[in-house]
Structure formats: C-alpha cells, structure tokens
Amino acid sequence: MRTAGSILILGAGAILAAAFGPAAMACEGTPGRDRLILEVENVRSNQGLMTASLYPGDPSQFLVKNGALRVWSVPAHAPETRMCIFLPGEGNYAVAIYQDENSNHRWDHKIFGHFEPFGFSDDPRILFSQPSYDSVKFTAHHGETAIRIRLEHR
C-alpha cells in the first residue's frame, strides 16, 4: 500500500531526475577529477548505439587501429545524445563518433552510398578524406570540459 509520503518521495525523485539527469549521467572509465561531456547534436533517431573514440594528444595515434585511449557506447537518443568519460588529465584530445544504427559495433560506410552518421570534435568540414588531428583537437582543462559534436548524415 502506498502512502502519501511514499508518493511524495517518488514524485520528488522524478522531478530531480528530470532536472538533473544529464548532469548526473554515469561517466565511462576510471573515476577521476577530470571528465569530458559530449553533447552530440543532429541525432535523427533513437536507433542503435552512439559510439565514441577518445584519442590522446599524439597526432600519430589519431584514427589508427588501437590508437584510441578509450572507445565506449551509449544508446542513441534523438535529437541529442549526451555522453561522459573520465579523462587521464588536462591536455589535448580528439574525439571521433558515429551512430551505430544496426548495433554491429563497426562504422558501416560505402564509397558510394549510405554512411552511418558520424562526427568529430571541433566539427571540421569533411569532404573526401578524413580530417587532420589538428582540425579536430581540443583542450581539456581540470574539472569538466564539455564539447558539442554535430553528426553528419550522408
């Protein structure tokens, strides 16, 4: 049997979750003082997973196999998906992200045809080749750093 007190507590919890949900999201990785909040815009569906790769300040590690410090996924949420990861410390980083619409854990793309939506930190203009590290790097500071990434749909 529910009492007025338990209903009040449940209602207050729902209000707090709605008000503070994004700030209270779970962060990926080893807990620490520094963290990155990704706000992924232009998410057109709730289909699949949003998968992000965090790259270190070394340009030679960018977009190479095993070059990422961490790869993690969360369920996609339209129109914006928020993600969080703990960082090893302040410094330069880069992020590559894609919406894994079929949840097969890889970015599906064809030379001529469908691409799963993708994006990079600092939203560089993408034409026919991958972006340079310098065009996507950002500086994370102690505490919380938030960046916005707009998904490209092709």
PLM features per residue range, with description:
Residues 51-55, 96:
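Beta-strand signatures of extracellular beta-sandwich domains
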Residues 7-19:
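Bacterial N-terminal signal peptides
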Residues 34-42, 52, 149:
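A short, amphipathic beta-strand motif
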Residues 81-88:
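Exposed aromatic-hydrophobic patches
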Residues 100-109:
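Acidic, glycine-anchored loop motifs typical of Ca2+
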Residues 73-79, 139-141:
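Short proline/glycine- and polar residue-rich coil/turn motifs
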Residues 91-97:
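A short tyrosine-centered beta-strand micro-motif
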Residues 28, 117-153:
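Extracellular beta-sheet/turn segments enriched in Thr/Pro/Gly and aliphatic residues
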